Amino acid sequence: MNKVVVFDLGGTLMEFVGMPPSWVDYYHTGFENVNNKYGLGISEKQIETAAQILTEYNPRVNYRENEIVAEELFEKAVASWNCNIPVDNIIEAFFEGIKLNTVIYDYSFDLIEKYKRDGYSVACLTDIPSGMPDDYFKKCVLPLIEKIDLYVSSQSCGYRKPNPYGLNYIAKHYGVNINDIIFIGDEEKDRLTAERAKCNFCFIKDIV
């Protein structure tokens, strides 16, 4: 029987240093950087409006389980700017302004290798920070992804935790019963995801 362990990423195997669970307080800074980088001459009110629109779609502010692609969110946020900057460039400048610093925890690689030695396939299921493109996030955690057999994110599967879709997708991918999967995470949302999917769960603090 194929054994599968699934890791959450943020707060479990890595973190963006100093960033809280909700990033809404950083949205204004991100949009300010877009304005400054491209010399758009956008007013303070327009920047604040863009930040507020992005805030309204933040799932930690207004609960949602369905994922929305980053490009759609940013197109809505800057609709009033009437600028001709490609949305991908806007997104890149936005996150440059936030100045993210990624740290992979010291134990992460050893833990992944331990499960592999024990015969497990190793997958991950992670919620992408609201508004962040999947490819951008993957670059931030590339050393981890290179060690993981299957990468699944809220952007790639279309649903955010605690929706069980991602875990069910992983079970189907490996052809295993969902009851035989172990999901490892750091917060109550992860535990609830496992409960709704009816698979096993461990808090990361209990195994490291």
What are these regions (language model features)?
Residues 123-182, 188, 192:
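Substrate-recognition "cap/lid" segment bordering the active-site pocket of phosphatases
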Residues 48-93:
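A metal-dependent, Asp-based hydrolase signature
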Residues 82-83, 109-110, 114, 163-167, ...:
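Short glycine/proline-centered loop/turn elements that form peptide/ligand docking sites
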Residues 1-50:
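Active-site neighborhood of HAD-like aspartate-dependent phosphohydrolases
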Residues 88-104, 108-140, 151-154:
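Substrate-recognition element of Asp-dependent hydrolases with the DxDx(T/V) motif
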Residues 10, 185-186:
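Acidic di-acidic motifs
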Residues 17-25, 62-65, 131-137:
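Short, flexible/disordered intra-domain loops and linkers
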